[in-house]
Regions:
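Generic beta-structure capping elements
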Residues: 46, 99-102, 163-165, 179
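Basic, Lys/Arg- and aromatic-enriched nucleic-acid-binding interface segment
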Residues: 54-72, 85-148, 155-156, 167
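Short clusters of hydrophobic/aromatic residues that line enzyme substrate/ligand-binding pockets
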Residues: 33, 94-97, 176-180
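C-terminal catalytic core of Y-nucleophile DNA break-rejoin enzymes
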Residues: 11, 159-161, 171, 176-180
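Conserved long hydrophobic alpha-helices within structured protein cores
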Residues: 37-50, 152-167
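N-terminal core-binding DNA-recognition domain of tyrosine site-specific recombinases/integrases
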Residues: 2-93, 104, 126
Length: 180
């Protein structure tokens, strides 16, 4: 936790903690970091790909998606790169590993008719109407929308200033920070 606390955003830090707890420790936790080899990493990725999901998914079984394996790799690579830089390990065993191809699936986007129907459904609640209208028409992240204040909206210019983002740290209280 101390390792990334100063440089990572709270949600990223939580994701990394989960990756370590659920995916790295069960397979590499009993191994001294300086003894981890490229082959160990390759086996880890293969194992995660085919049986890394803890709870069985109705469509995918215990397989993790290629995207998830790539996210775990990015986190592990960064940690081991820092360990190499600090001379804790002689080389980064994630370098040169074969990674799954990121199988990009196009995102499903609402068409105009679907968007109008959705907004009509939430129209009765002013807060949710404004929230979803902003989300659907701007591409802002959820935390950025939650961080908006009326003073950020310039009605004459028709613009929004995105100055802050709201996150929910582990304890559950709201935290206002900078945007990405």
């Amino acid at each position: 936790e101390d390792y990334g606390a100063a440089t990572l955003r709270p949600n990223t830090l939580r994701s990394y903690e989960q990756f370590i707890r659920c995916y790295i420790k069960p397979y590499l936790g009993d191994k001294i970091v300086s003894r981890v080899t490229r082959m160990d990493i390759q086996k880890l990725y293969r194992k995660l790909k085919h049986e890394g999901r803890v709870h069985e998914h109705p469509e995918y079984g215990h397989e993790l998606s290629d995207t998830m394996v790539l996210r775990i790799h990015a986190m592990l690579h960064r940690c081991l790169k820092d360990a190499e830089r600090d001379h804790i390990i002689p080389y980064n065993p994630t370098d040169g590993t074969k990674l799954p191809k990121n199988s990009y699936k196009p995102k499903q986007v609402l068409d105009r008719e679907q968007m109008d129907a959705f907004l009509a459904a939430v129209d009765k609640n002013e807060t949710w109407r404004d929230f979803f209208y902003t989300e659907l028409t701007t591409g802002l992240r959820r935390g950025e929308i939650c961080g908006l204040m009326w003073q950020d909206f310039d009605e004459k210019a028709g613009t929004l200033k995105i100055l802050r983002s709201v996150n929910v740290p582990k304890a559950g209280e709201l935290e206002i920070g900078e945007t990405k």
